Amino acid sequence: TVDAIDIIRSALIVVESPTKARAIAYFFGKPARRTINDFTVYEVASGQLILNVVASGGHIFDLTTEGGFHGVLKDEEEYIPVYTDIRRCSNCGEQFTDREECPVCGSRNIRSKRDVVELLRKLSMEVNKVFIATDPDAEGEKIGYDIYTIVKPYCKDVERLEFHEVTRKALRKALAEPRSIKLPYVQAQVVRRIEDRWVGFELSRRLWEKFKITTLSAGRVQTPVLG
C-alpha cells in the first residue's frame, strides 16, 4: 500500500571490516547477499528500515607521495595535505599510493580503493539514508569523514553512528542516537598522519643513505622507543 511504502525506508550502514559488516547484518536475522565487484553487501530488514551493510576495508585515502613535501603543499602560512586513493598489491599485500606497480614485488596486479569509492556512490544512490559506523576513535572518524564526502552528493541524509561494542543492543542505541562527524578528531588524525609521513620518510631516507639498505624504515612511534 501507499502507507507501507511511505513507512518502510532503506538505509546503508558502512563499517570498516567485513567481519563487522557480517556480524551486524546477522543481528536482525539471516540477511540476503549480493556481490558488487567482489564486495559483499548484506541486506536485512530491521523494523521500518531495510538495512544494507557494507565494509570500507579501513582507510580509503592516504597522503600522496608526489608533490610538495612528502604529500603536503605549503601555501604561504598554510599547509595543505593532498590525498589520493590507497592501492594494495594482490600478490604480496603491500599498501601504497601513486604507483601502477607494486614497489616491493613489481606486480601490476593492483587493487585500488577507487573501487570502494564507486561502490559507496552506487549504494548511496539506492537508499534514503546513510549511517557511517566506522570505529569510535580518531582513525575511524577520519575514515568516516572520507566516506561522508563520498556519499553526501548522492544521499543528502548522512549521519554518524557511535557504538563501543558490536552487539544488537549497542547498535540499536546508536541508531536511535545518531550524531554528526567530530571534525576535531578528523583534524587530529590528519596532523598525526602528516607527522608520521614527515618523520618516517625522512628518517627512513637517512637510514637508506647510511646503511645502503632500502628496506630499512623508521617512524614517529618506534624510533623514540628504540632510542
Give the ranges of each region predicted by the language model:
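Charge-patterned, long linear interaction tracts outside catalytic cores
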Residues: 204-227
